Every structure is written in structure tokens, then in C-alpha cells.
UniProtKB/Swiss-Prot annotation:
Gene name as annotated: Slc7a7
InterPro entries per the UniProt record, alphabetical: AA/rel_permease1 (IPR002293), AminoAcid_Transporter (IPR050598)
Tagged with keyword Plastid: no
The protein's name in its UniProt record: Y+L amino acid transporter 1
Molecular function as annotated in GO: basic amino acid transmembrane transporter activity; L-amino acid transmembrane transporter activity; L-arginine transmembrane transporter activity
Domain of life: Eukaryota
Stated family: Belongs to the amino acid-polyamine-organocation (APC) superfamily. L-type amino acid transporter (LAT) (TC 2.A.3.8) family.
Membrane topology value: Multi-pass membrane protein
UniProt-annotated glycosylation sites, renumbered to this chain: N328
PANTHER family cross-referenced by the UniProt entry: AMINO ACID TRANSPORTER (PTHR11785), Y+L AMINO ACID TRANSPORTER 1 (PTHR11785:SF303)
Gene3D superfamilies: Amino acid/polyamine transporter I
Source species: Rattus norvegicus (Rat)
């Protein structure tokens, strides 16, 4: 679907432009390349990771972890294990991101290691379930926390929440279409806000501990449930809060000096989030007992009601702001995934085009926004989350298997960051556990998730694998017309790919 002429090595482009300038009137320098610009700094990278990881989870998930662990002590151990597991995964992705300098995270890594088929299934699953569902859920959570205070004695109107969620998605899509720097600025501001809110919770907890409120920590492991099923479900709840550590790998091509800033951003972000999560839970436990936490739908709000007095409204606001920042990071990541998928020929060409003046992937952002808006129309949207746990962890694990495979297949490949094999092997073993658990404990939803992934098979073999000249003429005309009009409306052209390692992009069957 993507012609090989779309991608030219940057040096060749510059040479052609230089020749043109020499033959012209010498009025100015060669035209600037139309491609994604490297505008994400180290600070932006840290804020993207922290901002996406700290969503609504830490304000809500403590209930799920405590429900299955059944004790404060074991729940803190689960939170620590979840943090260590996420650090292992993030370190593996740091090596992959500095070795394979493409945006798209696991999609790009699976494509490089195993070819187009598995990569397309990964993309198809994200397209149908993972990305639009998660964005719709985050937007609805944001809207609920913003609207509910206006209706203290009753439930907020359904339409009001959905309209506000739609407005949130549209606003953030517009911001990211306008300028990359606008999107990173929004991310930075809202990351600072949510971290400050959690610091306020932590300080309040420390004050209570200083006043002698240590009753809940006496015999903290009493009543613990060590059943493997309960441990697994508690770990799932914790990992929900830690999800997002791979955010920066979706925008690798836009990071300044990725060999340095990608692993450094991960190395800074992961300890920050893990420490904040542990201290926040300690703060919760210093005020609330097990019964209070299990009876609460939003632990942080219950905590604020008992501690902050007339300022208890600050925590629902903090949850809303946290969701807003998390949604922004999710939109950035998902749009780049669609962009790279189109560039590799797995989605229509128009999606990998870039605005000629703003250098933002406007078509992929709009496509992602439309998908999220469509999923807002699903009344029981939260049910869809249950369908992708299996698929998500399967493809994350497959990426790390690809890392091990590339170590064996290409041992001499340059790797700016090279980990001990201990990290990917341990992570793969843990991922097998995370994939097996939902198959056993939530078989129906897991099978539905597998079915959704496999529904991409006809599309792949009947369209993607078929050479363009053999596709129906009517289909080619529709695609060509749509691409042309979208280029005009979005002021976008095909992106040039700047390959720093000098390798030509892979074309043909493997990338198809």
C-alpha cells in the first residue's frame, strides 16, 4: 500500500535539494524535510511516561489489590512486585528502543523480529479494542469526576458525561494536531499537577503517622491470602496502575538523542512512580482500615473526606486532571502507532501523512480521535476492557521474545544499551504467567479477545498481502480519492523517513 518511492534516504534528498538550489537563483536554503521532528526532550519524555502511568489507577486500584491480598502488608508487597516487574519490562523496552529506532513500540519490535503477519495482528488488536477502548474509558472517568460534584444527591446524567468526554477527546486531538510542543506542554503541566496531588496525600499520611496512627500496620500480614489465584488477581490490579511504562517507545523517532534520553527517561520515571505508589498506599493505610477501603469506589476520595475537610473537593479534581493528562499521553502514543502501521503498509497510506507546516501527523490523530468517539457510543464500554488483557500481555511478551531472538539472530547488531539476558528472560517467564491466568480465571473474555485478534486474518490475507495492482479497481479508486481529498483537507503529504543507521526500510512481503 505504500510505494517504496515514498521513503528516500535523507542524504539523497538533501543532495537533490542542494543540486536544485545550485541551479536556481540561490534565494534560500533547501526546503525542509516533511517528517516528524525531534521535539521531545528528556523532561518531556519523563512527563510522558509518568503522566501516562499515573492515571486514575492509583486513586482507585488500591481497593482491588487489597481485596485479593486481604492484608495491608501483603498488598504493599504486591505493589512493590508490580513496580519491579514494570521496571524489568521498561528496561527491556529501553534496549529495544535504542536498537530499533522506530516509533510504534511493540508493533515495531514484533515487525522487526517476526515479520508483518504477527505485527499486523498486534496492530489490528490495538485498532479494534486496546487504544480506542482505553481512551474512551479514561475520557468517561474524567467526565464523571468533573460532572458528579454538580449532582451531589443523585447520579450525573448519562448524556452530560458522554458529551464532556467527547469534548475532552476533541480538545486534546486538536491540541496535538496544532503543534507537538502544545501536546508536550499539556503533558508536562498535568503531570506536575497529579504528582503534586499525590505528594499532598503522602504528606497528610506522614503527618498522621507522626501523630501515632500506626494501628493498621500492627500485624500487617494477618489474614493474608497466599492462594496463587488471589495473588495473580491482586498483581493484575497493581499492574493496571503501572501500565504506560512503554509510552515513550511509541514516539522514539521524535526523541532528541534517543540513545541517551530514552533509557534515561525510563530510568528516572520508573523509580519515581514506584516510590510514589508505595508511599501513597502507606498514606491511605494510615487513615483508612480494610473495611473502609473495600467499601470505597474511589479510595483517594474517601481518604480526602476524612483528612482534607472542606478541601476534600481537591482530590476528585486531581483525579479528573490525572485522567486528562493520561488521555493526552494515550492519544500521542496511539496516533504514532497508527502512523507507523500505515507507513509499513498495514493501514491506508493517508494515515501516515504529515502536515506540511506544523509537522504533526494530523490524519492519524483524527483517525484515532474518531475511533475513540465511536467507542463512547458503547454504553457498557467498561466491559470491553475485559477482552484485551490476554492480548495486551501476549504481545508485550512477544516483543521481549523478539528481543531474545534478535540477540541470537543478530549478535553483532549495534546496541547502545545491552542488558543482561536475566532481565528479558525473567520478564518473559512472568508474562507467561500473566497470559495464562486470565485464560484460566476469565476464560470467556480471554477467548473473545483472541477472537477479536484473529478477526484480522481475512483482512490481512485478502487485502494486505494482495499486490496493489491485483486489488479491485473500485477499491483502488476509492482509496486514491480518499487519500487525495484527505491530503487537501489536512494539508498533509507523505512523510519522509530519516533513517539514522543508513538502512533502507524493509519492503515487500515481510513488511506486508
Amino acid at each position: 500500500m505504500v510505494a517504496s518511492t515514498k521513503y528516500e534516504v535523507a542524504a539523497q534528498n538533501e543532495a537533490d535539494e542542494a543540486d536544485g538550489s545550485a541551479q536556481g537563483d540561490g534565494a534560500g536554503p533547501a526546503a525542509e524535510q516533511v517528517k516528524l521532528k525531534k521535539e521531545i526532550s528528556l523532561l518531556n519524555g519523563v512527563c510522558l511516561i509518568v503522566g501516562n502511568m499515573i492515571g486514575s489507577g492509583i486513586f482507585v486500584s488500591p481497593k482491588g489489590v487489597l481485596m485479593y491480598s486481604a492484608s495491608f502488608g501483603l498488598s504493599l508487597v504486591i505493589w512493590a512486585v508490580g513496580g519491579i516487574f514494570s521496571v524489568f519490562g521498561a528496561l527491556c523496552y529501553a534496549e529495544l528502543g535504542t536498537t530499533i529506532k522506530k516509533s510504534g513500540a511493540s508493533y515495531a519490535y514484533i515487525l522487526e523480529a517476526f515479520g508483518g503477519f504477527l505485527a499486523f495482528i498486534r496492530l489490528w488488536t490495538s485498532l479494534l479494542i486496546i487504544e480506542p477502548t482505553s481512551q474512551a474509558v479514561i475520557a468517561i472517568t474524567f467526565a464523571n469526576y468533573m460532572v458528579q460534584p454538580l449532582f451531589p444527591s443523585c447520579g450525573a446524567p448519562y448524556a452530560a458525561g458522554r458529551l464532556l468526554a467527547a469534548a475532552c477527546i476533541c480538545l486534546l486531538t486538536f491540541i496535538n494536531c496544532a503543534y507537538v510542543k502544545w501536546g508536550t506542554l499539556v503533558q508536562d503541566i498535568f503531570t506536575y499537577a497529579k504528582v503534586l496531588a499525590l505528594i499532598a496525600v503522602i504528606i497528610a499520611g506522614i503527618v498522621r503517622l507522626g501523630q501515632g496512627a500506626t494501628t493498621n500496620f500492627e500485624d500487617s500480614f494477618e489474614g493474608s491470602s497466599f492462594a496463587m489465584g488471589d495473588i495473580a488477581l491482586a498483581l493484575y490490579s497493581a499492574l493496571f496502575s503501572y501500565s504506560g511504562w512503554d509510552t515513550l517507545n511509541y514516539v522514539t523517532e521524535e526523541i532528541r538523542n534517543p540513545e541517551r534520553n530514552l533509557p534515561l527517561s525510563i530510568g528516572i520515571s520508573m523509580p519515581i512512580v514506584t516510590i510514589i505508589y508505595l508511599l501513597t498506599n502507606v498514606a491511605y493505610y494510615s487513615v483508612l482500615d480494610i473495611k473502609d477501603i473495600l467499601a470505597s469506589d474511589a479510595v483517594a476520595v474517601t481518604f480526602a473526606d476524612q483528612i482534607f475537610g472542606i478541601f476534600n473537593w481537591t482530590i476528585p479534581l486531581a483525579v479528573a486532571l490525572s485522567c486528562f493528562g493520561g488521555l493526552n499521553a494515550s492519544i500521542v502514543a496511539a496516533s504514532r502507532l497508527l502512523f507507523v502501521g500505515s507507513r509499513e503498509g498495514h493501514l491506508p497510506d493517508a494515515i501516515c501523512m504529515i502536515h506540511v507546516e506544523r509537522f504533526t501527523p494530523v490524519p492519524s490523530l483524527l483517525f484515532n480521535g474518531i475511533l475513540a468517539l465511536v467507542y463512547l457510543c458503547v454504553e457498557d464500554i467498561f466491559q470491553l476492557i475485559n477482552y484485551y488483557s490476554f492480548s495486551y500481555w501476549f504481545f508485550v511478551g512477544l516483543s521481549i521474545v523478539g528481543q531474545l531472538y534478535l540477540r541470537w539472530k543478530e549478535p553483532d547488531r549495534p546496541r547502545p544499551l545491552k542488558l543482561s539476558l536475566f532481565f528479558p528472560i525473567v520478564f518473559c517467564l512472568c508474562t507467561i504467567f500473566l497470559v495464562a491466568v486470565p485464560l484460566y480465571s476469565d476464560t470467556i473474555n480471554s477467548l473473545i479477545g483472541i477472537g477479536i485478534a484473529l478477526s484480522g486474518l481475512p483482512f490481512y490475507f485478502l487485502i494486505i498481502r494482495v499486490p496493489e495492482h491485483k486489488r479491485p479497481l473500485c477499491l483502488r479508486r476509492i482509496v486514491a480519492s480518499t487519500t487525495r481529498y484527505l491530503q487537501i483537507i489536512c494539508m498533509s503529504v507523505a512523510a519522509e523517513m530519516d533513517l539514522e543507521d543508513g538502512e533502507l526500510p524493509k519492503q515487500g512481503p515481510k513488511s506486508k
